[in-house]
Design a protein with these regions (language model features):
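Histidine-centered, transition-metal-coordinating active-site segments
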Residues: 2-249
């Protein structure tokens, strides 16, 4: 019971006292500087599984991590591996997570989930915190939709078939800005998908043994957040969608 409560507190600290007394333990799992085991895990796994040819020197970073003033800091000699870590994460989000095809299929899957919500009680599971039922909602749902003859699933089947045949939303244009754009369209055939990508996280990593290098550059500046607005439509020759994109050029 103690270990379970401890793990829960590390993931989501319930008291300020816990954070102050064991801040470095919390940082191992979720660090405001963006360097933690959770991010290392998915960056290494996702780059390998998607064939993205970028590596992370995770062992060098971990071997040069120290606890000082009750928080995690890093030896200055692993500045480059840490910068490479941030760069790889940035590329992963740009090229994989927010790729036009990925966000398009995600949008269609959301539509499928809306269509089957009543049959599978998805919203009800979350509202009533019925997590046993919730975790039973696996990818098998797709097979169920595909093979079970149920008129209530007709629209979900159509969307699933569109995904299979790549009859999905196409990218009309992408706008990158330093703040979120207030862009909407009353046309239901035009979909606006907004995301944001951080290079750094909430704060910069802190280094030790940094006395041999003097820099006149301002390194204490977080890279700005990129706000990405994708204008998507099933048909890229949609005049209204193209006009909406062109209006931002």
């Amino acid at each position: 019971d103690f270990q379970i409560e401890f793990i829960k507190n590390v993931i989501d600290p319930s008291t300020i006292t816990f954070v102050i007394q064991t801040k470095y333990l919390y940082q191992i799992v979720s660090n405001d500087n963006g360097i933690d085991v959770d991010r290392m895990d998915y960056i290494m796994r996702d780059t390998k599984m998607t064939g993205l040819n970028y590596g992370v020197e995770h062992m060098r970073i971990m071997d040069n991590t120290v606890v000082e003033d009750n928080e995690l800091k890093y030896d200055a000699k692993c500045k480059i591996p840490i910068e490479s870590f941030f760069t790889t994460r940035y590329i992963l989000y740009k090229e994989i997570c927010y790729h036009k095809t990925v966000v398009s299929i995600e949008h269609h899957i959301k539509d499928i989930l809306k269509e089957i919500d009543e049959q599978f009680s998805i919203t009800k599971c979350v509202r009533e915190e019925d997590w046993e039922q919730y975790i039973s909602l696996t990818d098998n749902i797709i097979s169920y939709i595909d093979f079970i003859p149920d008129k209530k699933l007709t629209r979900a089947k159509e969307i699933l078939n569109d995904i299979s045949e790549r009859n999905i939303l196409k990218l009309v244009g992408e706008i990158i800005s330093d703040k979120e754009l207030d862009i909407v369209s009353p046309n239901k055939n035009i979909v606006i998908i907004k995301t944001k990508i951080k290079y750094h996280n909430k704060e910069l990593p802190k280094f030790v043994n940094d006395k041999k290098v003097k820099t006149l550059l301002n390194e204490n500046v977080l890279r700005p957040v990129e706000h990405i607005t994708k204008i998507m439509c099933k048909y890229t020759d949609n005049e209204e969608a193209n006009a909406l994109f062109e209006s931002y050029l």
